[in-house]
Structure formats: structure tokens, C-alpha cells
Amino acid sequence: MKRPTKKLNFLNFLLEFCSHETAKVRETANQIVLQMQSSGDYRDIIEEYSVMYLRFLISPTPPALLFGEDRGRPIIQEIWTEDIVKVCLYLFLSLLPKNQKLFKHLVEVYSNSKAQVHVDFGLAQGGVKPITVQRTILRELVSAVGSIPIDSPELLELVETCPPGSEVLIMRIVQVLTDKVLPTPELVDKFRNLYKDRSQDVRLLIPVLNGMKKQEVIQGKYLS
């Protein structure tokens, strides 16, 4: 595996296995790919591949590329399921804590994903019900963003440039982080500006309330 061509072929197999139906296969391939990414080998290729899979979620139906005997899904499905959405997120969310510049791709996909996901909630809760791809993204990103520093420059930029339609995603990311640590003054300021520039919906401030001045909150400055 010293020759580049052989290593690239090996990497290609690994990347394909990162979306395999069998969890053990997927996890093993993902671990090796992350090691290769951390060492700097083919970092761009790995990240571009993860973004390609992430962008599948903009499509109204799952692409045929996700199916086949070699993927552990011999039958092509024409509707999104929660498991297939998770597979498309798997590698990308593993890379996100290592490179927060990938945030911009997550925001783009979240804002443009309109498809529904069919989720089996069990007979007691009504069986199979449709939810949005966006809701699945919000649920899956929790473990991925938890290790991101609260003072991440990319996080501050994300809040500052918050594209319309991505407010809930950004609120969720920051809420996960501020469950463990206080928001920085810079982050609080970014949310204040976001509140003023948008609909002045006070819910935008919820993730950073514990970083605001007590008097500011008591006076209800943002509740009028």
C-alpha cells in the first residue's frame, strides 16, 4: 500500500464501506478513514467525499449509489428512512469536530433539505410517521458538536453569517455547547446582533441566556 494508486484504491473501498448497512463494517471503515484524515493523507479527498454524501440529503429521494449488494442494501428504496439519512451524515459528522470549516456545508444542506423521512415510532406511538430530514440532522449532530470549542472562530462566523432558514440549526449547535460551558461574550454579542437583524424572536437568545448580564435578562429588554 505504499504506491499512491494502491492507497487511493484502498481509500476508495474504505469510503464506500463508511456508508455500509452493517454497523460494524461502517464503524471499522470510518475509524481507518479518520486516521488517514488526521495524518494529512488525502484529507481533501476524504472531506469532499463526506460532503458529497451530506449533499445527497438535498435530493427528494435517496440516490441509487447508496444501494447494491456491496452496500448491504440490495433493494433500492425510493423514500428516505432515518437509517439512510444517518448513513449520509455518518462520515461528515465524524469529521466536523476535526475541521469546523465544514460547518458551511452543513448549514447549506440543512437550509435546502425539504424531503421527508419515514420513521417507525412503534405501534404504541402510531407506527411509521414522516418527519423532515432537518429534524433528523438536528438529532444526529448532538454528539458530533459536543467536543467543538465554544470559542471556535468558525462557530462565531456561523452565527454572524447565519443564512435565512438555518436559525434553528445554529441555535441547536450552540445550545449543545452551552449545556456544558458558558458562552463567550463574543458569542453572546453575535446572538444579540442576530436577534436585532432578524425577526426579533426572543427564542434566538435562548442558547446564550446564561451568558447575558443578569440585569439585562431581569429587565426583559428583549421581550418588548
Task: Label every PLM stretch briefly.
Residues 1-224:
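Eukaryotic alpha-helical solenoid repeat scaffolds
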